[in-house]
Amino acid sequence: MKATVLRLYMHESRRFRGMLLYEWLLEQGRKLGIHGGSAFRAVAGYGRHGVLHEQRFFELAGELPVVTEFIVSEADAERILALVRKENIDLVYVCWPAEYAATSAPDAPAAPGPASDSPGGTS
């Protein structure tokens, strides 16, 4: 099925309306009726200022990048971005078309069996 991947980037400690921003974004997605969203914390990263952030010292807590991701329709991606703009939240985001499916879907291609994909296996 066709979808749009929307990723929004922020520091993990960034807050909005008394909540961590990534939690607020996920909550807003739920309120918009979006079926799922996830937040991922980076191990390390740097942004436009070139400063590398890593979790090495307790003092750096909250400085690592977090990505909040939604796999949605193009219209739902626009709804999320419209809300972010309306709330005047300054974020970097990326958006691209994708296809999604579940491996348990009836029309998913069958996985190759052990005999056909193992070296020296019998067929």
Give, region by region, the residue ranges found by the protein language model.
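Positively charged, small/polar-rich N-terminal and surface patches that mediate targeting and assembly
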Residues: 1-123
